[in-house]
Amino acid sequence: MVQSCSAYGCKNRYDKDKPVSFHKFPLTRPSLCKQWEAAVKRKNFKPTKYSSICSEHFTPDCFKRECNNKLLKENAVPTIFLYIEPHEKKEDLESQEQLPSPSPPASQVDAAIGLLMPPLQTPDNLSVFCDHNYTVEDTMHQRKRILQLEQQVEKLRKKLKTAQQRCRRQERQLEKLKEVVHFQREKDDASERGYVILPNDYFEIVEVPA
């Protein structure tokens, strides 16, 4: 017969590969056996010679150290249990079933005119509704502001491009003016000295009387 734990809710069974030992009720010591029965707290439970409790319900000081936690001390009593009373569990389940689940306020129909009326705004529902509106309004305002900023950036970019083009045109005009001034100065100098500047294929400058 496979040994199993008699504690309520414990599913431990003997397995040679698991470090769990099983200890029979001390039937030959009635006073100690009653302590075990009281600790188990099972209604109408009477231990037999096959009844046992696994080592998981005993504290470490209940075992003899020299026996590698396989033998109990003479007055050891199990104290580690997770009690769940059946009737309490049933009552909890029944109370949970009886509690109505919260539901949002339903729309009402006015019998006199047959129109669907909006749901009654309770304080909680109204608070959530207002918070939602604030969030939507903030988001719309932010999107509108972003669009305005993007439009401003685009306008500034166009203005910058136009200014750069105007600057380049002015630089070209300035270069042309410099060339004209330089040419005019050379022309004036040649006129004052009575020289005529000939093309490059001439190798000398011919002086003419003024």
UniProtKB/Swiss-Prot annotation:
Highest levels in heart, liver and kidney. Lower levels in brain and lung. It is found in: Nucleus, Nucleoplasm; Nucleus, PML body. It holds the Pfam family THAP. Disulfide bonds: none annotated. Its main location: nucleus. One of its GO terms (molecular function) is DNA-binding transcription repressor activity, RNA polymerase II-specific. A motif (HCFC1-binding motif (HBM)) lies at residues 131-134. GO terms for cellular component: fibrillar center; nucleus; PML body. A zinc finger (THAP-type) spans 5-57. One of its GO terms (biological process) is DNA-templated transcription. InterPro entries: THAP1/10 (IPR026516), THAP_Znf (IPR006612), THAP_Znf_sf (IPR038441). Residues 137-187 form a coiled coil. Keywords: Cell cycle, Coiled coil, DNA-binding, Metal-binding, Nucleus, Transcription, Transcription regulation, Zinc, Zinc-finger. Interacts with PAWR. Component of a THAP1/THAP3-HCFC1-OGT complex that contains, either THAP1 or THAP3, HCFC1 and OGT. Interacts with OGT. Interacts (via the HBM) with HCFC1 (via the Kelch-repeat domain); the interaction recruits HCFC1 to the RRM1 promoter. Belongs to the THAP1 family. DNA-binding transcription regulator that regulates endothelial cell proliferation and G1/S cell-cycle progression. Specifically binds the 5'-[AT]NTNN[GT]GGCA[AGT]-3' core DNA sequence and acts by modulating expression of pRB-E2F cell-cycle target genes, including RRM1. Component of a THAP1/THAP3-HCFC1-OGT complex that is required for the regulation of the transcriptional activity of RRM1. May also have pro-apoptotic activity by potentiating both serum-withdrawal and TNF-induced apoptosis. This is THAP domain-containing protein 1. The gene is Thap1.
